[in-house]
Amino acid sequence: MDSAVDRHVFYISDGTAITAEVLGHAVMSQFPVTISSITLPFVENESRARAVKDQIDAIYHQTGVRPLVFYSIVLPEIRAIILQSEGFCQDIVQALVAPLQQEMKLDPTPIAHRTHGLTPGNLNKYDARIAAIDYTLAHDDGISLRNLDQAQVILLGVSRCGKTPTSLYLAMQFGIRAANYPFIADDMDNLVLPASLKPLQHKLFGLTINPERLAAIREERRENSRYASLRQCRMEVAEVEALYRKNQIPWINSTNYSVEEIATKILDIMGLNRRMY
């Protein structure tokens, strides 16, 4: 086994494997181990299942340690092949379905690809999410100020504080139409809320970041530039935070938060509907 890896972890599904990955990562994050992740989506036939089993077994025979296997598979014949492997296998969906089946006194009707696949029942939701992504891309970094009234949230902040990835995550994960507007160095001499944003103040949300972190990020983009200097970063952050306070714009410091955490905080603070797809 690689000395830097404590366990090999498989995420296996007859669909996208997103559910297996999300739940598996959540579980593994509770343990102080270094993992090597292997995601195998669309394991839909016995031939592919046997190849996956062989891959699991090969790692076991190579390392002497059972790989951990998080799986979500509908067809019993495919599950049976995976369960014959040398891995420690956990059915992440059935672990929850079984007690719910007993509580609700209902039999489940498992269908492959139901969670992240397209069906007549979720097509409208899917179209709405794609429309949100299109809107967010068209309104990234102040590219367009048209139709800003259609935004559900407008993120503000200095360059490289996390506006774009947060906007895209909100659109892709939750179907939120998120615009974002940058404050640049030229704005700092007389930083005011742009006239186009004043009527939409109830949709504004600010991001800030520690100047030291901002300087490090900018240094990777423009080495040894005024743009990346700590002095410039301190000045810009101070000016923008003063603007937030003056205009009573809610804001958070993104320095120690992941994109997922930032987006979730925005949804909570702004009272936006959290839609899952």
From Swiss-Prot:
GO molecular function, one term: protein serine/threonine kinase activity
Transmembrane annotation, as ranges: none
GO biological process, one term: regulation of DNA-templated transcription
Pfam families: Kinase-PPPase (PF03618)
Protein residues bound to ADP: 157-164
Keywords, in A-Z order: Kinase, Nucleotide-binding, Serine/threonine-protein kinase, Transferase
Catalysed reaction, written as an equation: [pyruvate, water dikinase] + ADP = [pyruvate, water dikinase]-phosphate + AMP + H(+); [pyruvate, water dikinase]-phosphate + phosphate + H(+) = [pyruvate, water dikinase] + diphosphate
Cited PANTHER family: PYRUVATE, PHOSPHATE DIKINASE REGULATORY PROTEIN 1, CHLOROPLASTIC (PTHR31756:SF3)
Main function: Bifunctional serine/threonine kinase and phosphorylase involved in the regulation of the phosphoenolpyruvate synthase (PEPS) by catalyzing its phosphorylation/dephosphorylation.
Stated name of the protein: Phosphoenolpyruvate synthase regulatory protein
Protein's organism: Escherichia fergusonii (strain ATCC 35469 / DSM 13698 / CCUG 18766 / IAM 14443 / JCM 21226 / LMG 7866 / NBRC 102419 / NCTC 12128 / CDC 0568-73)
Record lineage: Bacteria, Pseudomonadati, Pseudomonadota, Gammaproteobacteria, Enterobacterales
